[in-house]
């Protein structure tokens, strides 16, 4: 058997063993995809014992390409929400999550200086303690750029594996500890979260209002400031028994019923100006109007603003809502359309069909993957990661590397959405498949390289010490920030658990947090809010630590 065939066969065996290990769960918690690392260690141990030689160049390529695939697909997935998560609504959550990352880096630095832990080892412990595989790849990349011998770089994977198990268990223990210390009633916390959502600005709602303000009688909708803003959409108007789709030039009369869409505060302000909220139904049932959802799949409308498409003037159709990446938004006239956006339309059947033809509404297109943008994005990301940044006082030029470059490029492209006929939307199933393939390839190679010396290091070397260092890196930031968030910020317990899981980019921890309450979405919401920024910082942190310590030592 050739070296290439043998290497591929061994990698396939590692994936099978590792994924089987990852599927083993104790009380609902398992290693998940991290099991591939331990599958690689097991197979690597026996491969080393048998004296089998694998293709080193091929293993190196597979490891790096797997990492690129993983971080790129993460960036495409979270890109649309990344910059939004940095705004005020998620600012507090992100600040606490960033504090966890910073404290983890500080604890790592202190352990490195006090116990003189070799740089590759301490970076591996850090990556394993925070259960972040891209951090491992980024650390190995910068160490190679700094000229670290290959055998020392491979130690990083071994120390990562030592610290990884408590990295997963530590966050679960922290959640349990917070619940114990503060005597949390999970049901009460879930109700508080639902109440805060209902009173906040995060949900798009509707309101039916009767026109009672005499100053509005015989005025056009476009002349009423609250109705001519991008905060409120008037999607239906009922006069006597006639339901119609209003246009900006529609004249309002006293007694008209308006169906408005917007955020709760804006709807309340509109009600104060216009008249009284009523329970009268403005349903399209039994009328010649209907409400339908259509999806943007036509490349010709990508990047165009809603106002430029003139749907109301041309087709007598109103867009009442816009759903992007699962988030309901008011259909602002300045909003630019992206591939996969879902529009809520109100109008006559023939008119809605005409608009659907314009925007595409081809469901099968949502399941297709444009491979050209994928490789353009990966290529640009690798180029970005290879650009040297010379900083005075540092021994080598800083680079984003093969982990940071594709991630940042994917975040940017995911946020842009499309350029001309190229769009960076990727079906969730395709994104997940590429992401899982990438991380399996990466972890399989890391495990194989670490497996030969793993048992000796654990039983006769410093493996137990590495585990102890990892416990400090995991526990100190999580417990400290958990206490601060609960005591001083009065953070909801379920929101806190999601934030802690997101700060460690740990899906098993998110699954555990979700199981705390069957119906509350608090944990998922906070996890998704902090995940993009934290993933970026987790990849950058080991590179900064490596360059700083290399310069000092």
From Swiss-Prot:
One of its GO terms (molecular function) is monoatomic cation transmembrane transporter activity. It comes from the Bacteria. It holds the Pfam family TrkA_C. The keyword Metal-binding does not apply. Its main location: membrane. The chain crosses the membrane at residues 4-24, 28-48, 65-85, 95-115, 158-178, 371-391, 393-413, 437-457, 464-484, 493-513, 533-553. It is a multi-pass membrane protein. GO terms for cellular component: plasma membrane. The keyword Oxidoreductase does not apply. NCBIfam families: PRK03818.1, YidE_YbjL_dupl. HAMAP family: YidE. This is Putative transport protein YidE. It comes from Salmonella typhi. The lineage of its organism: Bacteria, Pseudomonadati, Pseudomonadota, Gammaproteobacteria, Enterobacterales.
